[in-house]
Amino acid sequence: MAFSLVSILLSIALAWYVGYIINQLTSRNSKRPPIVFHWIPFVGSAVAYGMDPYVFFRECRAKYGDVFTFVCMGRKMTAFLGVQGNDFLFNGKLADLNAEEAYSHLTTPVFGKDVVYDIPNHVFMEHKKFIKSGLGFSQFRSYVPLILNEMDAFLSTSPDFGPGKEGVADLLKTMPVMTIYTASRTLQGAEVRKGFDAGFADLYHDLDQGFSPVNFVFPWLPLPRNRRRDRAHKIMQKTYLKIIKDRRSSTENPGTDMIWTLMSCKYRDGRPLKEHEIAGMMIALLMAGQHTSAATIVWVLALLGSKPEIIEMLWEEQKRVVGENLELKFDQYKDMPLLNYVIQETLRLHPPIHSHMRKVKRDLPVPGSKIVIPANNYLLAAPGLTATEEEYFTHATDFDPKRWNDRVNEDENAEQIDYGYGLVTKGAASPYLPFGAGRHRCIGEQFAYMHLSTIISKFVHDYTWTLIGKVPNVDYSSMVALPLGPVKIAWKRRN
């Protein structure tokens, strides 16, 4: 009897599975995006997409065109590739495309309640305005010497660098730690920076692990890393709350760091930011600032190490603008175009985020076609794909910073719009969007350029180096596209 029941259940399951496969092969609605064929229900194309998103996108585009849907762990993801897809997602209307529903389940356990994607969009825009007010040129001018001081302290004691004349350094091991120190000292203030020397870095790491791909789908799973994530969030939030309360009760003059800035901010209705909101925003700000800088600086140093002649060109540019003594000033960066081109080119080849997503709220027709993207799908755009295509960039996979010398800055004459946190360029029909576009464009872009410019300038002033081995492939197992490690350079100290 039991055997018969098992046989019946297996037969039903087999019949359902055969029907599932046949349905993929035979049912094609010309008004819906084509669905990428997959053998395993629910899992769908998750493995192929997760291993190398750009290879997956190119293979699917060759079969289905620029618009197609793939199943990823139970979710229907509609990819819209190309510059038209970039514009469609980044400039989509709030009523049509929702970022909060795409990301809140991932970000809220890490950042906390009532911040980032755990709030209505109009409140998020106010939060971005508050943070942007603390990311002005006056703050950047004070940040440059702070970054240089942190780098001096770190590099002089690092086992990979130290006081020697030459050595070998593992960039994946050293740069994330160094950028935690520089980002925390500038954006967060002296108290938070001191905390990293007392174990804050371990808490940051535990919190960072909450951004694992599995948490896009199952953020509530009782995994050890998720328990560590929740514990780290509580401790870090408590630390920020104590700093805020201590500052409110002190007679200390306000400084230029972000905590002081947020403590003085008020909503349009006149109410001040709550302390737990400031704490959550500070956690988000630290992770955003450190993630982008850590990933990008590893790529920058690796790519420069593969072409040491560019390091010497940067050195000549630096000597011409700054002199041989490294007395850097923020306002000098505008006179160092090659430095800027190196950052642009690195972000073109290796943008930190490979996929940008929105929840589709109602059926959306694709311009110029009969296809309609159905409500409740997740729309996906991949600007990093267009940034590495021959249609837009000659020898697109080569690291060639000088290519930017001949390109027009699309932002200079682009239409601008204010989403509530200051003017940003509206144009998103571009092959190069490393910081996104539209209402969710990254407000930390200028900080990132200042941060990276200072770190690169310090390395160019102090060292020459070459990459050991070939330029690494990309590790897509994390949310931010880091190189596959180890990534080692052989360095020599300049005389």
Curated annotation (Swiss-Prot):
Membrane topology field: Single-pass membrane protein
Top EC class of this enzyme: oxidoreductase
Family the UniProt entry places it in: Belongs to the cytochrome P450 family.
Protein's recorded name: Lanosterol 14-alpha demethylase erg11
Sequence positions that bind heme: C442
Organism: Schizosaccharomyces pombe (strain 972 / ATCC 24843) (Fission yeast)
CDD domains cross-referenced by the UniProt entry: CYP51-like (cd11042)
Its EC number(s): 1.14.14.154
Underlying gene: erg11
SUPFAM superfamilies named in the record: Cytochrome P450
Function, as annotated: Sterol 14alpha-demethylase that plays a critical role in the third module of ergosterol biosynthesis pathway, being ergosterol the major sterol component in fungal membranes that participates in a variety of functions. The third module or late pathway involves the ergosterol synthesis itself through consecutive reactions that mainly occur in the endoplasmic reticulum (ER) membrane. In filamentous fungi, during the initial step of this module, lanosterol (lanosta-8,24-dien-3beta-ol) can be metabolized to eburicol.
Quaternary state and interactors: Interacts with dap1.
